[in-house]
């Protein structure tokens, strides 16, 4: 005999299983995308580009313009203070 509590428990278990399966599927997709990105960096390095510099540029492009400009200004200030310009 199923009680309301048993049905609620079954629904909760099914919902939990669904969440976990979605997370696992997304983790697989994330790994595949990371592998694809790694392949692109390998390809660009093979074409003579500096992968470290490209990674830096990719990171800079993710930033908002004003944040990037602020960071660059602070770095330039510190470089000037250390006589690096």
UniProtKB/Swiss-Prot annotation:
It comes from the Bacteria. InterPro entries: GapR-like, GapR-like_DNA-bd. One of its GO terms (molecular function) is DNA binding. Coiled coil: none annotated. It holds the Pfam family GapR_DNA-bd. Belongs to the UPF0335 family. This is UPF0335 protein BARBAKC583_0130. It comes from Bartonella bacilliformis (strain ATCC 35685 / KC583 / Herrer 020/F12,63). The lineage of its organism: Bacteria, Pseudomonadati, Pseudomonadota, Alphaproteobacteria, Hyphomicrobiales.
